Amino acid sequence: MVRFLLFILFMSCQPKYDWLDTLPKPWNLNRREFSSYLPLFQKKYPNFSNRIKAFSLWQVGKPYQLFCLGEETGKDLDPIFRMDVSDCTVHILTSIASVQSKNWDEARSNIIKIHYKKDPNGISMPTYKSRWHFTSDRIQD
């Protein structure tokens, strides 16, 4: 009986993710539509861990394209932020940037902070040279 009650208590404390099934897929949305869902994620999942899990689950099934982020200029013309295609790294980066944002432009700004090294003045500028190219580069002591 105690196990059953603990199970019920545990399950009732878990966030519900079935709401995600009611949403259109993020890769089918334009920027304005995508922006309209970001505040809903913050309201529905106020806890950061639950929100990032929910957002990550929402992206499952997105078309796969390797090396799909760039600087929009210079050596790599791919977009800085995108939701139409993804690879493993982009999935994580867009999730982290999006769940901390209220709209597309803020998510784009956040991904620059996450995906690019800071210059000597502490500013992250999207250039090929300043991009974190390897996961191991992101590991700080």
Give the predicted meaning of each segment.
Residues 13-141:
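Cysteine-nucleophile amide-bond enzymes
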